[in-house]
Amino acid sequence: LLVSSENKTKNNKKLQINLALNYGSKTELLNAFKKLKNSKKILNEDNFKNYLQTRDIPDPDILIRTGNTRRLSNFLLWQIAYAEIFFEKKLWPDFNEKDYNRIIKKFKSIKRNFGNI
């Protein structure tokens, strides 16, 4: 299923969807810190981000959490700092295009400030 989906969308350029399988943000952060420490580079956001598993992927603008659970579950803790987070009651298999479009519409109405007041 994943290979088929990847092949069908390999030429798409407008939207990027990432699935994180067997991923844990705490482990990613710890490993990135260890690598940065061993590199002797200055500890700053840019240097740190270069050691994350997701270094070549843009930070998400939207996080959709399905399953009527209001937690992040150790998912992209660094990367979602400025993402808009939507919690959905539906389970992932039941989440459909109508649900997705509703979230996109809501997202477009949000004035994002990226941490500024």
Labelled PLM ranges:
Residues 1-117:
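Flexible, compositionally biased loop and terminal segments
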